[in-house]
Amino acid sequence: MIKIGSYNIQKAIGMDARRKPERTLKVIQEMNCDVIALQEADKRFGPREATLTPQQIAEHTDYKVVPLATRDASIGWHGNAILVRRSMDILEFERLDLPTLEPRGAVMADVQINGHRVRVAAMHLSVIGTFRKRQIASLMDQLHARSNALPTVLLGDLNEWRDKAKSLKMFPDHFEVTSPGRSFPSAFPLASLDRIITSPEFTVQQSGVHRSDTARVASDHLPVWAHLLIGSPDTP
């Protein structure tokens, strides 16, 4: 069993408009996932400083940062970061450009989880529907172009309000799109903006939204998660 999660941390700024990294780190630790995709992990302008430093993450959580950043002060690429348990092997990683009018991107990491090599792709998509479709198409093309196919999980803030939206149809038909629940805004969730998409090698056993008291105030999004099995339920 693998537990994977996604969390738009809004640069560690909570619903009280205060930047409190220790609060965000508490939520990350509460989630207790094997892999966590973060969105808005870095500040948007200037040196793109991380709002959670690798030192803070190491001190306050059981995770380490996949080294995706191109700037010394950052932990991600266009705000997208991936955290994995300290004991986990990071086998490969890559930054992926996405078409858009504003700075957007996705990140990918191949990791070893419970004896399985798994590919994780994390994203934060455009607020404009046309660009969301193009971004998903581009992301899938880049993943399919890789020489080695692996069990794949895609996740993040898709900025898509409707479960039957055209943008979600850009994922292959044999992939499962999971909406764990309403995650935005965190105080009174109305929309399922955060989703988890899995290739056929995975079975989604359970999914949900992390709704702790701290999570309700730490960001404008609540984290989402899913328990995954590799292989069908009948596989011994």
Spans of model-derived segments:
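Active-site regions of metal-assisted phosphoester/phosphodiester hydrolases
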Residues: 1-35, 59-60, 64-236
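Active-site neighborhood of divalent metal-dependent phosphoester/pyrophosphate hydrolases
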Residues: 12, 39-46
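Short, flexible, glycine-rich and Lys/Arg-enriched loop motifs at helix boundaries
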Residues: 45-54
